[in-house]
């Protein structure tokens, strides 16, 4: 039997077999597979009317909502690419993504909570976006501007389109093959160069991976339900949601993570699966102090972004938090692997595990100094080969080439080791990239914004742990060393262009940065800077 790996194949068979089964739940509203299919058809038709065509890039800047997923599936049917934009981003980051993705269209909503999307967009330099043609506004009202960034604004109104909604018209074998290999989404990830890179996944790499998750994580038993508390614009939120859909498992969408609301939803819908961070676990535990917090949960897959997570697991697992360590990235997908649940607690909660794809994926570890492959138990750089790996970094062939070995393994930049049974353990990032707010952040991105502030000559940023949370802190050299600018005022200036989780918790002025000589010139000693920061925080 030949399998189709278009994005529509993720749920097409469920629509045919159980059209009235619940697919999504948001704010108490149940959306069936039939209702979702009708919305996707209308959205596809509307986007085509607006001029979206195959190979176009459409930036989507929305909170978690049914429309996000409908737009995604509709774009995939057209053969266009969704450019995922984090709702936490501000003008600096939004401009970077729009410019570097070559997005022709931008879909956003008017506002949400304290976020005024239109106002943020106004801070983007319109003249440096030659590809952008049209802006589409969800939830438009009488206050919606006629233009943004000197481009026309059209109201996003797919529900007004008339379609049959009767069936999924499967593409021909030839057309399906062409769609499978088209880029379906660009995720953003950090890197060693200025600004994030755009990670390209095709319909095949994405749809095949979420099927691996559904099977490998044993999704879809009677009564299973997923709470999507993470943003759909990131791999952890999107991959888990699509895997649940592939397994015909209801997905409860949260537009914004709030621990009180999330706790209520878990109990109300008898949620069995949730994915997040150790910080989310801490907040759940504080919100639900009873001896057994949740009785329905089967799996709380988590990534540890701070220290002392083993102590946390020892406390929470007996209280109804079935914690399991995971591994993933934008390049290899989230939920790439998970630890076996029968392992001792201390091993079960470590990052890494066994690939969801089973024998179709291969993991090895290489010594960064000798470049020899490591035996089990010896640490080195984790390398991964899988049919669902990303296809490259958009418009960045040099970075793409550097990311792979000659025999097709992705060089993750992560430190880890193999176990004797073939599973692996993730230990830490090998480079300077920081994990902030649940996202990988390149410090040079923050450094560039700091250096652009008045009276700042240059800046260096490192990550430290403050009150149990990973935070960025900064050192800067003032143009006038005798009279440096006010640190608080400088950080307020940074806040105008960077997402809140990227803003340094502290800024200290120094006369010079610690450096060390190398064959390629002077290099900044980030380890020394981190030590200096920890000393100041004592």
Stretches with model-predicted labels:
Residues 2, 20-51, 56-65, 69-73, ...:
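Conserved AMP-binding/adenylate-forming core of the ANL superfamily
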Residues 32-34, 177, 184-211:
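Conserved AMP-binding A3 loop
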Residues 49, 80-159, 295, 478-480:
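Structural core segment of the AMP-binding/adenylate-forming
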Residues 89-96, 106-108, 274, 386, ...:
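AMP-binding/adenylate-forming catalytic core of the ANL superfamily
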Residues 207-225, 233-273, 287:
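Conserved AMP-binding/adenylation subdomain of ANL enzymes
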Residues 272-276, 285-349, 362:
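Gly/Ser/Thr-rich phosphate-binding loop
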Residues 354-360, 372-403, 441:
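Conserved ATP/PPi-binding loop(s) of AMP-dependent carboxylate-activating enzymes
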Residues 499-523:
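AMP-binding/adenylate-forming catalytic domain of the ANL superfamily
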